[in-house]
Design a protein with these regions (language model features):
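Cys-nucleophile CN-hydrolase/nitrilase-fold catalytic domain and related Cys-dependent amidase chemistry
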Residues: 3, 12-92, 99, 165-196
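Short, acidic/polar
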Residues: 5-15, 144-151
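Active-site beta-loop-alpha junctions enriched in small/polar residues
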Residues: 75-77, 102-105, 139, 203-204
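Glycine-/acidic-rich phosphate or pyrophosphate-binding loops and their flanking alpha/beta elements
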Residues: 117-131
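CN hydrolase (nitrilase-like) catalytic-core segments centered on the catalytic cysteine
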Residues: 48-71, 133, 139-234
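Amphipathic beta-strand/beta-sheet edge segments enriched in Tyr/Trp
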Residues: 82-102, 216-234
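Active-site-proximal beta-strand elements of phosphoester/diester hydrolases
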Residues: 1-2, 6, 86, 99-102, ...
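A short, polar/charged loop-to-alpha-helix boundary motif
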Residues: 102-116
C-alpha cells in the first residue's frame, strides 16, 4: 500500500471530523499501511519509524491546525532490533501528550505480531490531554480485563482501543457473528465493570495475504462507542 496516499486519505477524514465538531479523533491500529503482520517478512521492518518521527510530525501538524486530539497507532523503531506497536496521543497544540506500547502481542495465523513487536514496557498509565485522561490500549489488549482495570485504577476517564481484527475467509456466517459479538461484548463489559465509556476503532475491508499462504483477512469494522453502562452510542 502507498503510505503517503494512506496518510493523505486519513488526513482528509480527520479534517472532515474536525469540521463536524470532533475534539478527539481515534485512528485504527497500524493505520499508515496495510496490516503487514499477515506474514513474517523482514522487509516489513522498513515500515517502522522513530517516535518522534515523520508520522508524529504529520499528525501533530494536523492536530495543531485543527485544534483536535488525535490517537495514532504506529510501528515504532525504538532501537536496532527493538520494535513496538505503539499508540501515540497528539495534543491539540501538536505536541506528543504520551504514548502506550502494546502489551499483549498475538501470534495466531495471519496475526504474526510476535515476529515484529516486543511487548511494551510503559505499563498501563492513562495519558492526560485537554479532552480528559485517556486510557489508551491496543487491539489484543481488549481481551484482558486486567488492562482495562489498571487503566481505570490510574484514573482514566475513557478507554480507547485502536484495533485490527477480522474474519478468516473460511469462517461461516455463524462463526463470524460469534467472533464479532464476543469482541463487542468483552469491551462493553470493560465499560460496565469500570464505569467508563469505551471507544473501539477497527479496520474495515478485505486485505489479501501477500504471501498467498492464506486467503487474507476480512476486517469487520463495527467500530463503536459505548457508555459506562455498556450502552451503544455509535
Amino acid at each position: 500500500a502507498d503510505i503517503a496516499d494512506n496518510k493523505t486519505r486519513l488526513a482528509e477524514g480527520i479534517i472532515d471530523l474536525a469540521k463536524r465538531g470532533a475534539e478527539l479523533i481515534v485512528l485504527q491500529e497500524l493505520h499508515n499501511s496495510l496490516y503487514f503482520c499477515q506474514v513474517e517478512d523482514v522487509e516489513n521492518f522498513n515500515l517502522a519509524e522513530p517516535i518522534p518521527g515523520p508520522s508524529t510530525e504529520f499528525y501533530g501538524k494536523l492536530a495543531k491546525d485543527l485544534g483536535v486530539v488525535i490517537v495514532t497507532s504506529l510501528f515504532e523503531r525504538r532501537a536496532p532490533g527493538l520494535y513496538h506497536n505503539t499508540a501515540v496521543v497528539i495534543e491539540k497544540d501538536g505536541t506528543i501528550a504520551g504514548k502506550y506500547r502494546k502489551m499483549h502481542i498475538p501470534d495466531d495465523p495471519a496475526y504474526y505480531e510476535k515476529f515484529y513487536f516486543t511487548p511494551g514496557d510503559l505499563g498501563f498509565n492513562p495519558i492526560q490531554t485537554s479532552v480528559g485522561k485517556l486510557g489508551v490500549l491496543v487491539c489484543w489488549d481488549q481481551w484482558y480485563p486486567e488492562a482495562a482495570r489498571l487503566m481505570a485504577l490510574q484514573g482514566a476517564d475513557i478507554l480507547i482501543y485502536p484495533t485490527a481484527i477480522g474474519y478468516a475467509t473460511y469462517d461461516t456466517e455463524e462463526e463470524q457473528q460469534r467472533q464479532r459479538e464476543a469482541w463487542t461484548t468483552v469491551m462493553r463489559g470493560h465499560a460496565v465493570a469500570n464505569g467508563l465509556p469505551v471507544v473501539a476503532v477497527n479496520r474495515v475491508g478485505f486485505e489479501p495475504d501477500p504471501s498467498g499462504q492464506t486467503e487474507g483477512i476480512q476486517f469487520w469494522g463495527s467500530s463503536f462507542v459505548a457508555g459506562p453502562q455498556g450502552e451503544l452510542h455509535y
